[in-house]
Amino acid sequence: MGKGPSRSMVKRSTILLGIFAAALLVWMAGVLVKYQIVNYNYYQTRAIAQQTMDTTLAPNRGSIYSRNYTPLAISAPVETVYIAPNSIDEEDRRTVAEGLASILELDEDAIYQKTLKKNYYEMIKRRIDAEVADEIRAWIDEKNLEGVHLVEDTKRYYPYNSMACHILGFTGTDNVGLDGIESIYNEYLQGTSGKLIAAKNAIGTELPYEYETYVAAENGKNVVLTIDETVQYYLEKHLQEARLEQKCIEGAAGIVMNVKTGEILAMASFPNYDPNNYYTITDQMALDALEEYGQEERKEQETAFRNKIWRNKCIVDTYMPGSTFKIVTLSMALEEGLISTNNTYSCPGYIRVADRTIRCWKSGGHGHQTLAQAIQNSCNPAFISIGAKVGPTNFYQYFKNFGLTEKTGVDLNGEASGIWFSKFQEVELATASFGQNFKITPLQMITAVGAASNGGKLVTPHVVKEITETQEDGTEKVVKSFTPQVKRQVISAETSALVCDLLEEVVTVGSGKNAYVKGYRVAGKTGTSEKIDVLNATGEKYYISSFIGFAPADEPEYAILVMLDSPTAGEIYGGIIAAPVAGDILADILPYLSIQPQYTEEELETLDVSVPSLMEQSLEEAKALLIDKEIKFKVKGDGDTVLDQMPLPGSTMPQSSTIILYTGDAKPSKNITVPNLVDYSVAGASDRIASMGLNVRVVGNSNAGSTALVISQSPAAGEVVPEGTVVTIRTNSSVGVQN
């Protein structure tokens, strides 16, 4: 029988075993410390992730409203489709891919590859409409599928498409603002996301509803703009029409602003885009330009055109303001007492400054003129003389005081500051006096003119009126308001009033006469500036044609700027092509803005009246009614009852028109051929139409009398119409408005 282990051997084994056990315990303690203390948060997060499934609940993005609470940007409920690959049975993967690809019009193989992943979330498609979501639900039920889910989401809509697009901006696929108000006020608009936390079992399947935790999303706040959708509509309408008619290859820009508060009622820039599909080029002039490029160049040019349509020319692009800047030169010289209405100027068509000869736009010169006439004529030599009196130091100080060396501070992104001279001496002062060889933005220009007209106060322009929060009862609670900010007093109220008087005469008898609006006192200044930088770079001559003004001239409330960039249709002068646009806009918006007209007796005769219904009335009753309304008439036929009339009831006609009353067997017949009236004077066209038994309506913004010419007509020349038809002629003046 063999001997067992010796006592010493057992002792050694026991000691070794004890050491091993102690080491094991130390190691286990270390592991426990590592997992439960040192890396507790990490492993807790992993454990929770394995036991729960989080779904982010998107908040409703706040709306953007006009000042009248008309929705300009809204979020509508949609749904997002995603899959949980770990929850999809092996035999269902191809079915899931085929079905989703068919319903959502996506690539089947791409979806199938997502079903093979070992996770619990793969996004398939975001923001699908309710009808598509319902189709997916029906398909899930029909196929009895697991792992295909729909979750609530929101989609941004812009009900008015491209209207005010450069102010509103747009959002990206994640509903985060990328430009405009959507970007600047994103922190207010976006809200706070919620969560749906669902428990799941060991194989990744969701547990019943009672194991869910729901954290509600907090919806975003609403932004109320100073923009008036009606004013915005008219600004865009007339600006786009002018841009197309004048073939402005670099677009157009326009602003309507309250001169007292700095509130921007409308701001438009062309070319523009639809924020519902901001990546798509829809502007027809841009699309036509792209057709000139081959397939290889087109992609590169499309990128350039997208950048162009996204640019807000009102605040991003700088330009030479030309003669519209004479308002600022006039204001500073009057404020300093360096000139008065008693000053006179002589213009031979040029002026010598140092070693330069600077010419007036009128080659023969304006001759002897008063200060008022120099402004009406937009005489360059006169304003060079005025600028010289101010001097370079004082001139620059006023330039700075009018806010032209800094950004306006408008609550929009991308605002540029102006470009001033690197040196400012005698020649530079001369060209600056009439708005050449330096650059500012359109918004800087209208803000400066606002100060010149509102009593001398420089006001910060803004587009946001207030931030609101929608209450449970649907009402809006204001959580933040934006009040007018006056930066400084630039000129005195007395100087401002004199500037207004002088600029009103520019519109009544001067270069701005095409901006005249019946019944309203409009003041303003035209401008035509050469794009010197383009000339130097390419050798080609292009111009900026503009008009800036305000109304009412005796108590200014609203300023307007119209800028046409690089017109190529033939005319370039602001007085000819920009002033009429401003006049058309003002004619539409001033009555809407409750500015009451005050008509002269001559204007009253040209106003439209509603044509009364006289048919089936006795001839004597019809005559009495027309006599009472002071409307002229002519009777055809020998009956006692009015059987027909021309113009027709419910239409409109000028007060001075004649109504034809048909009685007995007499009937209106189309027997008069409308003549071609284009290029006729207003008087000549009116006389010819009247001699043919037709009525005339004169529209347009000309207060130029005999110098106004017909530029279009309706009905067109050659159309055959009945006696008494109203022929509308549109007029414009090209005399004395070339600047």
Feature annotation, model-predicted:
Residues 1-289, 309, 318, 393-403, ...:
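Periplasmic/cell-envelope proteins involved in peptidoglycan metabolism and beta-lactam response
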Residues 73, 201-212, 260-324, 328-564:
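Beta-lactam-recognizing serine transpeptidase/beta-lactamase-like catalytic domain environment
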Residues 73-75, 157-161, 216-217, 247, ...:
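Extracellular/periplasmic catalytic domains that process cell-envelope and extracellular macromolecules
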Residues 75-83, 115-120, 213-223, 479-482, ...:
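Acidic/histidine-rich, surface-exposed loop or edge segments in extracytoplasmic proteins
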Residues 76, 145-151, 245-246, 342-344, ...:
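Short, well-structured beta-strand/strand-turn elements
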Residues 145, 249-252, 340-342, 407, ...:
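Short secondary-structure junction motifs
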Residues 471, 519, 533, 541, ...:
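Ligand-recognition elements built from short beta-strands and adjacent flexible loops
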